[in-house]
Structures are given as C-alpha cells and as structure tokens.
Amino acid sequence: MIGTKPRVGNFRRHWRHARAAATALASLLLAACAQVWYATVGSADSAHDLAIRRGIVFDAEHALKLDVYAPHAAAGAPVVVFFYGGSWEAGRRRWYRYVGEALASQGLVVVIPDYRKFPDVRFPEFMSDAANATKWTFAHAAEFGGDARRIFVAGHSAGGHIAALLACDKRYLAKFDLTPRDLAGMIGLAGAYAFLPYVEDEAEIFGDDAAGRYDSQPINFVDGDEPPMLLLQGLADDEVTPNNAEAMAERAQAMDGTAVLKLYRDTDHGDLLVALARGRAGQPPVMRDILDFVAKPPARSSLLPSGEGTPQGRMREKPGSLQ
C-alpha cells in the first residue's frame, strides 16, 4: 500500500456528533462567505446570463438531486461535475451555488449533485451516488449545451477524494457502463488522496480492515490509465496537507500518467474556493488554472512548461512530478 503522512487538523474530533456539527457549520460558513463575495465582486451580469436548473432528481430511490448551471445558448461546452466537501459527513449542493455560477459564467456547464453521507451510509455507498450522477451527466449533458466528450469530474476536499476515486478506480463507473477514460479529466482542489493512518471517524466511514484502508486511498489506483489530473493545493493548508497532492502527482509520474500540480503559497484549505468565487488580483489563479486545463488537457506524458511565480502562489508543472 502506498502511504503518506497525512493532513487533517480540523477533521479530528473527540465525538462523532460534535465533529459532524462542526464540519457542517464550517462548510456552511465557507459557502455563505464565498457566495456573498461572489455576488459582491463577481461579474455583475453573470447570473443573468446563465440557465439554471435546480432540484433535478437523478436517483429517485435515494431521493438524490442535482443542480445544473449553464451559459445561455451554450453549445458543445465543456462540462464539470463538481462534488463538494465536508468530511464525507456534511454539505448540501445549494451551499455551492457560487461554484456553479462562477464556472458557468466562464462558459462551462456545471453539475453539482448531492450524495449520501456518513453516518447514514459508509464507503463505498457515496461513491455509487457519485458515479450515478456522472452517468446522468453523460446522458443529459447535451440538453444543457454540454459536450459529453468533454466531461470532467472535480471536487474540493472530501469531494476531491470522490472525484479522484471516480477517475482512478475503474469499479465505480463500471457499474454504470462507463470507464475513467470516458472522462476528459479530473480536477482536485485540496483533495484527500493519501490520508492514512485514519483519524477518528475515518475508520468508521471507510472500514479499518486491510481492504477498506486500501480501497479508500485514490493514490493506490493510479496506474497511468486514468484521465489527466489537475491537482490544486494550498501550501498553508493544515486540513488536507500538500503532501496529498504531491504524492498523487509523483505516483502519476511513476506510472507514466499525467498530473498537473499547482501549489499556491499562503493559501489554506478554504482559500481555493474563495479564490474561485472572487477571482481578484493577489489571490491564487484557481479559475485561470482550471480554465486552461479544461480548454486543453495535457496529453499523457507530455512535458509542460515549468511553473511561473505569482504574488500568492508558486506553481510546479510537469506531468506527475515536481520541478
């Protein structure tokens, strides 16, 4: 098994319910703040130029719904399926409206699904929900002006973990007659890719036997056959520490895969989403980096230009490695 010394500051809680409540509150506050910032400093007419459909049922059995954000009159647009974080325990799709609006205002079709969470379900049940939402997206992307040949899975924190497993572990999409290579790419924002040993509830969420520990780690399934990966990570993140993204990129290089690693100085766990919402000077160029990747995902094993410095970030670019 591939192991890295993990991250997780605030994921550690003494009591399950206190931890879940704190996670939910933190997720809600982050989402609320970013939404206010986006509404204040974002494009004044961005939301008015969007076609938004909320509450679409994609899994009637489990009452799961998703929201779609698309530019008006979109045609052949790239599609991003975004999975929000919350320690696999908290979060709601409506809290991340600002993510949908921000990305859609840049020409992308965005799908934000809900998924079941602990303690209602344990791993891998929420992975089945994520794969099901992805299958729905393939079937319906064209209805919203999206291109089913250019569907990316993305996520922040625990959502980045979910997106990475969809892209790397073939079993989840296979249940819905898809493969990871049907995806155009994976975009992880401070994703948890290599987080053993577990802390607190993680053993209950994923299972503390050998199979559960192995299957929970996206890094174990990087074999060079996954789609290109964009790994965005703040160097000041003490919840999901940078060695998650660094180890994932190094593993991709070792397996002759493609991972573009972007490391941002003075950026913590929530700053990536705030930067995505605000996009102001002096913040890490999260939106620009996502748009560049979506516009032209790097070919497998192709050498990318070395990273450039920015006031808030230093970026190391090379498929699956550091420079």
Locate predicted features.
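N-terminal cap/lid segment of alpha/beta-hydrolase-fold proteins
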Residues: 36-73
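Short beta-strand/loop motif that positions the catalytic acidic residue
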Residues: 231-233, 237
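C-terminal catalytic histidine-bearing segment of alpha/beta-hydrolase fold enzymes
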Residues: 255-301
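Short beta-strand element of the alpha/beta-hydrolase
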Residues: 76-85
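Alpha/beta-hydrolase active-site loop
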Residues: 122-141
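Primarily recognizes the serine-hydrolase "nucleophile elbow" in alpha/beta-hydrolase
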Residues: 138-200
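Short amphipathic alpha-helix adjacent to the substrate-entry channel of hydrolases
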Residues: 94-111
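Mobile cap/lid helix-loop segments that gate and shape the active-site cleft of serine hydrolases
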Residues: 45, 61, 191-221, 227
